[in-house]
């Protein structure tokens, strides 16, 4: 039985850290791409800043997750209460930034696409300012609901204690009373329903506008659209796929979070939730890079420069 547990832990550890490695590499590439585009003086799209910001947030979040989860498999030792509170709260904080920035990206894209006759059109001129304030407010609100971590997270002193909810081998959560458990469950449900609902509405709105635009174009041309999509259409489809992927992951993660709240201390649910919770951060940049045609142009331009430098040196 111990041998089976060891094999299971080894396989799970390899799978999880493979996901983390893919996510760190992909987010680094996406962040470097946007940095190079800015340095080269290319005209940025309105969605470039939120996408670059979410890549940076995901990069830091995955690094924190790797450090915390390593303690899940093998105790790092030397973790006191302050260390536990700091790392777990920082991880939750960057997760909140990820969710809020993704929500902002979805709403921002919907405002950009809305026609002049829409009520959302009045936000177009001031949308960056308004959305920045919305991002800050939602990040504070999202993080404040998880502020109980600063009290509940403690260093694990006794591995045999049945009163603690184990997070890693060095950190645990103090159990909550039934009233506090119901309160936080309600707040978590409200938070997730609000943000996921807002992203769902903006995603459906963008999909409706895209289908309407496609139908009108077909009617004007009296034929099917060219199979080659325009940069605007590719950008819209990228955001739509990104939002759809996020909504699926968030819904699944919310179900697991609620289940863990009900069945406190269930390690199996925790093992399932860890890779699910980081799935969006790990694989979303691959989706963006795959649909980013400017990346090909940048690579060709860099290759031409390298060839020219080599020819000059020779």
Model-identified regions with their sequence ranges:
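Transmembrane helical core of 7TM receptor-like proteins
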Residues: 1-314
């Amino acid at each position: 039985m111990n041998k089976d547990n060891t094999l299971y832990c080894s396989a799970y550890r390899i799978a999880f850290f493979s996901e983390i490695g893919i996510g760190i590499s992909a987010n680094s590439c996406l962040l470097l791409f946007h940095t190079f585009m800015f340095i080269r003086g290319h005209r940025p799209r309105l969605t470039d800043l939120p996408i670059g910001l979410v890549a940076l947030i995901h990069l830091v979040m995955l690094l924190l997750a790797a450090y915390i989860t390593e303690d899940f498999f093998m105790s790092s030792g030397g973790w006191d209460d302050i260390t536990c509170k700091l790392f777990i709260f920082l991880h939750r904080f960057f997760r909140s930034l990820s969710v809020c920035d993704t929500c902002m990206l979805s709403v921002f894209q919907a405002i950009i696409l809305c026609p002049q006759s829409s009520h959302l059109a009045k936000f177009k001129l001031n949308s960056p300012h308004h959305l920045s304030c919305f991002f800050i407010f939602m990040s504070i609100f999202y993080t404040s609901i998880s502020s109980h971590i600063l009290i509940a997270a403690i260093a694990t002193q006794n591995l045999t204690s049945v009163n603690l909810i184990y997070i890693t081998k060095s950190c645990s959560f103090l159990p909550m009373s039934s009233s506090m458990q119901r309160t936080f469950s309600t707040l978590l449900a409200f938070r997730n329903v609000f943000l996921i609902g807002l992203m769902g509405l903006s995603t459906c709105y963008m999909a409706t506008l895209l289908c309407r635009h496609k139908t009108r174009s077909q009617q004007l041309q009296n034929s099917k659209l060219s199979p080659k999509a325009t940069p605007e259409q590719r950008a819209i489809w990228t955001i739509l796929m990104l939002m759809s992927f996020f909504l699926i992951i968030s819904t699944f993660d919310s179900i697991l979070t609620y289940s863990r709240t009900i069945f406190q201390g269930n390690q199996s649910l925790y093992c399932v939730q860890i890779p699910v919770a980081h799935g969006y951060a790990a694989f979303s940049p691959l989706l963006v890079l795959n649909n980013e045609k400017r990346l090909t142009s940048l690579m060709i331009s860099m290759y031409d420069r390298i060839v020219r430098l080599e020819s000059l040196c020779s």
